[in-house]
């Protein structure tokens, strides 16, 4: 199994890079993980709803074009299914047993396009809270690492 994180936005603040890199390094011994940083559509100051929809479509095309054949696409969005850490660990164990490669899509500041939502095998919510997409990167990689630490009996998870 391989995990690829498809994320919109290439320039992140230093605190995001620091937090993400820490967990990214930790997870590698458990599962091969890759980050694909896709460009964010250029936005203006007073964008209309039609403009925002167009930006999401452009970013959605980037996400779909980055998918590899036979990858299971999972869309991260506030309206998705919530999982406990233990359920995530079980789900990841199942992916590994089935040999599934997984692509996790994080949208830009305006979310994911309808095309990405329709293409996704399932939708996952890290929280009912709306979060900035840079913060989602850190929360996602930490939860993936925590789930893998459970599956490998590593002492990181102490619930």
Curated annotation (Swiss-Prot):
Group of enzyme by EC: transferase
Tagged with keyword Metal-binding: no
Keyword annotations: Cytoplasm, Methyltransferase, rRNA processing, S-adenosyl-L-methionine, Transferase
Residues annotated for S-adenosyl-L-methionine binding in this entry: 76, 107, 126-131
Domain of life: Bacteria
EC assignment: 2.1.1.177
Chief location bin: cytoplasm
Subunit structure: Homodimer.
NCBIfam families, A to Z: PRK00103.1-4, tRNA_RlmH_YbeA
Full protein name: Ribosomal RNA large subunit methyltransferase H
Species this chain originates from: Acinetobacter baumannii (strain SDF)
């Amino acid at each position: 199994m391989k995990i690829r994180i498809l994320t919109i936005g290439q320039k992140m603040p230093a605190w995001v890079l620091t937090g993400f890199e820490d967990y990214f390094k930790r997870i590698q011994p458990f599962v091969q993980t890759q980050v694909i940083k896709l460009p964010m559509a250029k936005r203006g100051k007073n964008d209309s709803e039609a403009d925002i929809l167009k930006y999401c479509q452009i970013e959605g095309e980037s996400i779909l074009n980055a998918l590899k054949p036979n990858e299971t696409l999972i869309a991260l969005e506030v309206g998705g299914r919530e999982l406990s850490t233990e359920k995530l660990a079980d789900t990841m164990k199942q992916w590994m047993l089935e040999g599934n490669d997984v692509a996790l899509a994080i949208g830009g500041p305006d979310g994911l396009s309808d095309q990405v939502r329709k293409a996704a095998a399932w939708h996952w919510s890290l929280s009912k809270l709306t979060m900035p997409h840079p913060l989602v990167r850190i929360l996602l990689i930490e939860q993936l690492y925590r789930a893998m630490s459970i599956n490998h009996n590593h002492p990181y998870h102490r619930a």
